[in-house]
Amino acid sequence: MKAVVLLSGGMDSLVTTAIAHNEGLQLAAMHVNYGQRTWQRELESFRSIAGHYGIGELLEVNADFLGTIGGSSLTDHTMAVSGADLQGTAIPTSYVPFRNACFLSMAVSWAEVIGAQKLYIGAVEEDSSGYPDCRKVFYDAFNKVIELGTKPETGIEILTPLIAMQKAGIVEKGMELDAPFHYSWSCYKSEGKACGVCDSCARRLRAFELVGVRDPIDYDVRPQYIH
């Protein structure tokens, strides 16, 4: 069976790819440039991870209209990328308005054309930045949209294997599957060394700390987030 994996190059999408690969599926991987600050580094990670898993069917999509729309510190250089707030409950400035719906729409189109029946995305609800399009209820609803908006015989289903996991559990799952964490990139701000202080870096570093393993990528600073 064929499956499309939405592969940003980050830790969550890496582990999701490892899970799908472990299922013995024929994988096709899609990466989206949406005008984000670190798109070149993320693309490098995408290609490295796809190569590691021998994924030959790749689609690199330009969706930089999301950058033109703006409204997010990931795409709008007039907005500062906020520092980590691991206890915060407000939706952070890094939220890209309705981004995942755009990604899923493009991925479903491709899946329908290439005959894929599964669509994997590394969304995390439990231990994440609180993005509204990373909730299980959102993906349940989108599966209904796919059912209503594609040919009856298509049968595409979105799978979110990490949705209820904590970040530390995601690291442990990746280690269990021997995922190449050194290829992944999570930083919102930097393409050289990861900054270590944005929300994404902080959640990643804390997860590795909780597991008791050193994160293999380079950081400009490497704060301790467990006190």
Curated annotation (Swiss-Prot):
Catalytic activity, as annotated: 7-carboxy-7-deazaguanine + NH4(+) + ATP = 7-cyano-7-deazaguanine + ADP + phosphate + H2O + H(+)
Binding site for Zn(2+): C187, C195, C198, C201
Cofactors, names only: Zn(2+)
Keyword RNA-binding: no
Cofactor comment text: Binds 1 zinc ion per subunit.
Highest taxon, organism lineage: Bacteria
Pathway(s) served: Purine metabolism; 7-cyano-7-deazaguanine biosynthesis
Catalytic EC class: ligase
Listed InterPro entries: QueC, Rossmann-like_a/b/a_fold
Statement: the UniProt record of this protein carries the keyword Amino-acid biosynthesis: no
E.C. no: 6.3.4.20
Residues at which ATP binds: L7, S8, G9, G10, M11, D12, S13, L14, V15, T16, T17
Biological process according to GO: queuosine biosynthetic process
GO MF: ATP binding; ligase activity, forming carbon-nitrogen bonds; zinc ion binding
Key words of the record: ATP-binding, Ligase, Metal-binding, Nucleotide-binding, Queuosine biosynthesis, Zinc
Function per UniProt: Catalyzes the ATP-dependent conversion of 7-carboxy-7-deazaguanine (CDG) to 7-cyano-7-deazaguanine (preQ(0)).
Family recorded in the similarity comment: Belongs to the QueC family.
Name the record gives this protein: 7-cyano-7-deazaguanine synthase
